[in-house]
Design a protein with these regions (language model features):
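Extended alpha-helical interface modules used as scaffolds for assembling large macromolecular complexes
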Residues: 1-109, 134-141
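Domain-level recognition of nuclease-like catalytic cores that cleave nucleotide substrates
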Residues: 113, 117-141
Length: 141
């Protein structure tokens, strides 16, 4: 999973996350108000990314004009990743939620903290979750 993030392979990330969600979680795990459901997926993804011990992984980092969900600095001093998560109420809303996440990354300039650290090879991820499914999009900033 971590290799797929580093490679910018949104399709592989989506496949791995969907398998993990299907095998590990219960729909009851996200039993909360819609505006709080994202928190469960945020914590789950932080735990999964932590398996890469040499990465600096930070949550809710102030960058640009806001706070990005997850900011990751891999071993490569030029590389960085921004991950913005969204919860979609229905499966049909997954694509739109991903685009909303990506637009938020661009509009709020979440890449600023990484660029200030001298990182220029930055990947942005918009990930939307709905129950045991997800959609992942990636672009190079």
């Amino acid at each position: 999973l971590c290799r797929a993030f580093l490679d910018g392979d949104a399709e592989k990330i989506q496949k791995h996350l969907t398998q993990i969600l299907g095998r590990m979680i219960s729909i009851l795990d996200t039993k909360a108000r819609d505006e709080q459901k994202e928190n469960f997926y945020h914590g789950l993804l932080l735990g999964l990314l932590r398996s890469e011990r040499d990465w600096l992984i930070r949550s809710n980092v102030e960058s640009g004009d806001g706070f990005c969900d997850i900011l990751t600095e891999p071993e490569d001093p030029d590389a960085g990743m921004i991950i913005e998560l969204k919860y979609a109420a229905t499966f049909l809303e997954l694509d739109g939620a991903c685009e909303k996440a990506m637009q938020q990354i661009r509009d709020r300039r979440y890449d600023e903290a990484l660029r200030n650290d001298g990182r220029e090879n930055i990947l942005a991820y918009g990930i939307a979750f709905c129950k045991k499914r997800c959609k992942v999009v990636c672009e190079k900033l």
